[in-house]
Amino acid sequence: MKPATVSPIKIARRGLMLVISSPSGAGKSTIARNLLEADPDLSISVSVTTRSRRPSEIEGRHYFFKSIREFEALRATDSLLEWAEVHGNYYGTPRDAVEKAMGEGRDMLFDIDWQGAQQLQEKMAGDVVSIFILPPSMAELQSRLHRRAEDSEEVIATRLANSRAEIEHWREYDYIVVNDDLDRAFSSVRAIVEAERLRRDRRPGLFEFVNGLLTENPL
């Protein structure tokens, strides 16, 4: 006889905003993609950008690709929760989608740089959990950028030149993960997410649940 299936107890909690940043080539996008595939309770915040679309990228899935004029219109109407200029291109987070998700208690992942992370921390500090991904070495970072084979030598040189300045902001993040092994780094990030979901201050439903326990009479 099979044992009865016990349904998980649902305790209301606030959604969290998971911010993952790193210099180009350190692995944040791969870790973010793997996390989304493994965790059905997490959805991606799709950024808008003025950067040219890469061959492997899909409109609306990886980014919303905009002209500079379209991007400036979004900024002017306060339609972006945060925005930044990175490697000569603009990136931003659409406000409406994030506010809707937080209102419904859903978790969202943000694959953004340190400038965007700063703005989110300033505006929604209680909801943000930030993780910075470091490469094991600068030599390995350069090797990964070349292996990716999606950028020109000029673009790779620019990204490497900017990476040191980006790494300088590591102290501003809640957690630091060194990506010397992708599986190990992914496991570390996933453990962080699970722990943050269990924080008492993220779970207002605990008050009702605990009060119910204390008033329960099993006899």
From Swiss-Prot:
Binding-site residues, ATP: 22-29
Membrane-traversing stretches: none
Pfam entry (one): Guanylate_kin
A single GO cellular-component term on record: cytosol
Residue ranges constituting the Guanylate kinase-like domain according to the UniProt record: 15-194
PROSITE patterns with a match to the protein in the record: GUANYLATE_KINASE_1, GUANYLATE_KINASE_2
SMART domains per record: GuKc
Keywords, comma-separated and alphabetical: ATP-binding, Cytoplasm, Kinase, Nucleotide-binding, Transferase
Annotated PANTHER family: GUANYLATE KINASE, GUANYLATE KINASE-RELATED
HAMAP family, per the entry: Guanylate_kinase
NCBIfam families tied to this protein: guanyl_kin
Protein name: Guanylate kinase
